[in-house]
Amino acid sequence: MVDQRRSALGFVLLLLCLVLFFDCVVVGQTQSRFSEKLILLNLRSSLGLRGTDWPIKGDPCVDWRGIQCENGSIIGINISGFRRTRIGKLNPQFSVDPLRNLTRLSYFNASGLALPGTIPEWFGVSLLALEVLDLSSCSVNGVVPFTLGNLTSLRTLNLSQNSLTSLVPSSLGQLLNLSQLDLSRNSFTGVLPQSFSSLKNLLTLDVSSNYLTGPIPPGLGALSKLIHLNFSSNSFSSPIPSELGDLVNLVDFDLSINSLSGSVPQELRKLSKLQLMAIGDNLLSGTLPVDLFSAESQLQTLVLRENGFSGSLPDVCWSLPKLRILDIAKNNFTGLLPYSSYDSDQIAEMVDISSNTFYGELTPILRRFRIMDLSGNYFEGKLPDYVTGENVSVTSNCLRNERRQKPSAICAAFYKSRGLDFDDFGRPNLTQPTSKNASSGISRRTVIILAAVGGGVAFILLFVILPIILVLCMRHRRRAAQRGNNDRPKPAGEASQQPPKGAQTFDLSRLGNAFSYEQLLQATEEFNDANLIKRGHSGNLFRGFLENGIPVVIKKIDVREGKSEGYISELELFSKAGHQRLVPFLGHCLENESQKFLVYKFMRHGDLASSLFRKSENEGDGLKSLDWITRLKIALGAAEGLSYLHHECSPPLVHRDVQASSILLDDKFEVRLGSLSEAYAQGDAYQSRISRLLRLPQSSEPSSSGVTNAICSYDVYCFGKVLLELVTGKLGISSPDNALAKEYMEEALPYISTNEKELVTKILDPSLMVDEDLLEEVWAMAIIAKSCLNPKPTRRPLMRHIVNALENPLKVVREDTNSGSGSSRLRTNSSRGSWNAAIFGSWRQSASDVTAVQAGATTSGGGGGGGGNGLRNSGSQGSSGRNNNNNGNSSSSRRRQSSEIVPEPAAYGVVEDNL
């Protein structure tokens, strides 16, 4: 009996202990979860995040966005795409100290969220469980802490698209579990650490768009699992290591835009899985190995452009089964095109073999390409049917009956040097003797023909040259009058820095500092190729540091190459125009007769083309890019700069080179317009002058000669392509050299409609994370882009109206709901409908339809001939109302309709018709 009581008592005590134990566990978990919730609330406060994402009353593991838990503990935080409160937006900081106590945290993603500041040292001390760290596009600056090498569990490290500087820490070579490493689009300097050779699990290595120098470490050949390798846009030198041929799993191989030298290693033939090989824009030379690619190669893109390759291109390169792009332009390749046939399923996108020395006849192998640039070679014979159309360029060859070909003497000499015959474009040999009678007959006909041709030429010359002489005389008289009004003594020391004789005169004392040639030599290390940023059409750009350590960009212009007109125009522009949206001009050096130098402030984020796009770390084709807020900021900044040139300069200035690469970005992504050497006063280009005199119709597109007419609507068209590039994330839409841009725009524009917002998601950059409000802003920008891309120049909006629209994007797509009366709503709908019709209704109309729309717009304006002016004034009132809200004018305080933000283009169409 006693034993039974003892057993029962023991069982009760055991049960009591278990209850107490589980109670302690539950209490501990509750306290732990509560403390972690407090940590996240502190993080929300320090980063200024909105409470709707992390509400105080919710359970972080259940109700909070971006939180991942395991066994009740927080192990993952994703705040990418989060929006800040109004106060949080005013002063964003890298303030994440509360994370220090989340020792089990294995995932942290803040990509796209502005975190200006340096990465804390304690990241590599307190967060040792981290497996994923993504701080891409976070405005992080400073150096990468050496302690990150302690995060040995790390599998993904993405620090791309920031402002990180100094050396890449060698301690990153200790992250042996790392599979994704992306350091692209920063300002890293120095050499790539040899310790990276230890990262044997690496699948992606991207250090593109930095300032790295020195050789590529041969030890990288040991990274046998590597799939994506991108070292482009740096200053790597020395030959390509043959050890890279051991990367047998490599799919993407990009070493373009560096200073690599030597020949292509034979060992690269082992890269049988390659889909992309880009080694263009280097100093490579020699011949390509014949067996570099096999007939079973998976290669889709081959870029060898702008090197010094010679010899023949291996025949297999033309018939690669999956080839889409072949770009070998600007080399010394030579030989005949192969006569091999192709499979009809092997249609490729583009081939660019321009500026080489290929010769002979064009062969059927070209049938597989949709877009072809064959210019600058020595092809002869007749142009085949399959090499025609607007997507083909064959200029500067030796083709028969084609325009803009090389002189026959040059072609004959080229073929003679190779022991080949040339038929002189198929013309008969005029040196053969003829009979006396035939000679007499030909002579009489010749006299008649020459007389007729001579008379016609004389008439044309009189009709064309006389107006030109009159215009030049008037301009000369006007300039003389201006010089008479502006004569003054020149400052001391200015004489040595005068523009060349015959140039437009301007005041150099207002153009920044006059640098000496020795200063610029020292700043650029004697213009070392390692400091070369890019070769531009108006001069080569070098990075450098002045004596006081200020980073600068120096444009080197070779006057002997005929580039003097561009720099003179640029100096004249800077002497007369000044605006915060133009690239800061620091000075010049004009003391050298054959070379001139212009000095600009260094833009830390380069240009839009290099800051917007980068390859995704995934194997897909997606692009990862700037967040939407930054894109809209860039679009507005560029529009403000162009609006200044168009509307605040007299006469209006046309930029003529608006594209992503001419939109420069400082360290805060503020826009500065560059590439100003092409700027002209509206209507001042030579062809435009002739068109005005003869009343010929003008086009806003480049002419066949490559000269663009200087009218503001051309800038608007190009700006529309930039906006479309920002919306879609498609690389190179705004580039004038991109042959695919026109085709893509024709495919994308039907998805832009003022009536259906969801359509725009079909072309939206997939890397953008946007909520409903932001999607409406995207929609609005797409609508503005489409209006800019109207094929009729007179129906494109003015740039100042585009600025208003980008400042108020939601008003472009939202109807006014503040008005209560039916008549007000009717006016709103009518106004919006007119704007829709102005943008889209005439997209495919003829010129007569445009006139009809203009007449209708004038009539609806309710004032006879004043309808157009009324629309223009409404836009101006809206702008002034934004700056003077207390003037008592009710019209300035009401919400503007979409047609007021960007008035109907028909209202100002007459102005451009008279240009």
Swiss-Prot record:
It catalyses: L-seryl-[protein] + ATP = O-phospho-L-seryl-[protein] + ADP + H(+); L-threonyl-[protein] + ATP = O-phospho-L-threonyl-[protein] + ADP + H(+). Pfam families: LRR_14, PK_Tyr_Ser-Thr. Glycans are attached at residues 71, 78, 101, 109, 150, 158, 177, 230, 332, 391, 429, 437. Residues 871-892 have a biased composition (Low complexity). Disulfide bonds: none annotated. GO terms for molecular function: ATP binding; protein serine kinase activity; protein serine/threonine kinase activity. One of its GO terms (cellular component) is plasmodesma. It is an enzyme of class 2 (transferase). LRR repeats lie at residues 102-125, 127-150, 151-174, 176-198, 199-223, 225-247, 248-271, 272-295, 297-320, 321-344, 366-390. Residues 29-451 are extracellular. Keywords: ATP-binding, Glycoprotein, Kinase, Leucine-rich repeat, Membrane, Nucleotide-binding, Receptor, Repeat, Serine/threonine-protein kinase, Signal, Transferase, Transmembrane, Transmembrane helix. ATP binds at residues 533-541, 555. Residues 527-811 form the Protein kinase domain. Gene3D superfamilies: Phosphorylase Kinase, domain 1, Ribonuclease Inhibitor, Transferase(Phosphotransferase) domain 1. The chain crosses the membrane at residues 452-472. The active site is at 657 (proton acceptor). Its main location: membrane. It is a single-pass type I membrane protein. Its EC number is 2.7.11.1. It is found in: Membrane. Residues 859-870 have a biased composition (Gly residues). Residues 473-915 are cytoplasmic. Residues 1-28 form the signal peptide. Belongs to the protein kinase superfamily. Ser/Thr protein kinase family. This is Probable LRR receptor-like serine/threonine-protein kinase At2g16250. It comes from Arabidopsis thaliana (Mouse-ear cress).
